[in-house]
Amino acid sequence: MGLEVKLDASKLESWASQLSARGMRNAIRRAVDKSASAARKVALDIIAKDAGVSVARIKPGVTKLRRTTQTDLSASFTATKLRIGILETKGASVGAGGLRASTHRLTGGGSASLNIANAFVVRMANGARFVAFRKSKSRLPIKGVYAEMPSTAMGQDRAAARVAWQKEAEKQLAQRLPQEVQKQLLSEGLPYSPPADTGE
């Protein structure tokens, strides 16, 4: 997910005219990086809740923030197709009656029961395990049951995590950009005059 936000920059125009081009770019970079980092944390929390697992379990499926550069003022991260076993979700269990679990959806229809009567646990030689069920009466093939992937949680239109990311990014950048421009003005030894209070 890349940081693309809209904000009213008219109050910054007089400051920007006083700053060096490099100084202004550095101020923007700091504001974007900090805003994107804060928004990513919010997105991680929503993705975890959407899948019904802990944030720690989701983190390996979300890349670290790709920060801005002198030639690229965008910041982004990627939600991957990390597979998380259904048994790692809250309340999931496999017993004589098969799998009893829930889908934890903040997007769309919300949470729902997920019951598979003929599900069983497969234990691997390395100690790993996953829930599976047979697709037919034959011994093979079997199909694994997994929680929602991070890429799904972020990729859907109007996904809760995507909406939260965008909202937080916009709020953070609106706050941080004026602060970083002010810092840059002071570092360049230029006088700082706050914008007029319009009552907004």
For the regions a protein language model found, what residue spans apply to each?
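Short, Lys/Arg-rich flexible segments
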Residues: M1-E200
